[in-house]
A protein has these predicted regions:
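Intrinsically disordered, low-complexity N-terminal extensions of AAA+/P-loop NTPases
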Residues: 1-187
């Protein structure tokens, strides 16, 4: 059996970095790493890879390591097709051993007073889900981000009406669904 080849540091990129931060969070969950240890090791890794543009841009955006860790983990989960609606509570429980620290962070997110929201890196779906925003995708993917960004189609007046019709009309039973103008339609 031959040993696995080592990956050269020149191939190490933002995706590898985010995966490594995620692994640290998994260790925190298993209680083999403290929250302070998670923060310290993440800073140490950031300092080890100053040449990765993604890391330096994230550090410019977010001054506190706890917010950067959240972003790195969201990036990892998104890039691994785990979805872009991540449960806020699960992520915070993975980061913090102290429930009150997690509760304060959750409160800030829910009240809209959080750096990830201020910098338009995430949005909140419902009360509990963190959704990756286009700005975060641009940080993570750089020039290739267009493949993942929400595309806003330019519609002429006819295609606009067709899109509205698709959103509200149910062709199966010829009824209107969720239409705020349904009462006007019946009249």
């Amino acid at each position: 059996v031959r040993p696995m080849p080592t990956i050269s540091e020149t191939n190490y990129d933002q995706f590898d970095f985010c995966e490594d931060v995620h692994k640290l969070m998994c260790r925190r969950v298993k209680k083999t790493l403290t929250t302070k240890g998670l923060f310290y090791r993440t800073k140490e890794m950031e300092d080890k890879y100053p040449n990765i543009e993604f890391i330096s841009k994230v550090k410019e955006e977010l001054s506190e390591v706890k917010h950067r860790i959240m972003l790195y983990d969201l990036c990892y989960l998104y890039s691994m097709d785990k979805g872009d609606n991540i449960e806020m509570r699960s992520m915070l429980k993975a980061m913090y051993s102290d429930h009150m620290d997690a509760a304060h962070e959750q409160k800030a997110l829910r009240l809209g007073d959080h750096p990830l929201l201020d910098h338009k890196l995430v949005t909140i779906e419902g009360d509990e889900k963190l959704k990756v925003d286009d700005r975060m995708l641009q940080l993570l993917y750089g020039d290739a981000a267009e493949a993942f960004l929400t595309i806003v189609k330019k519609l002429d007046r006819y295609s606009f009406v067709a899109e509205i019709n698709k959103a509200f009309y149910n062709p199966r039973d010829f009824s209107m669904r969720g239409n705020p103008f349904a009462k006007m339609h019946e009249a």
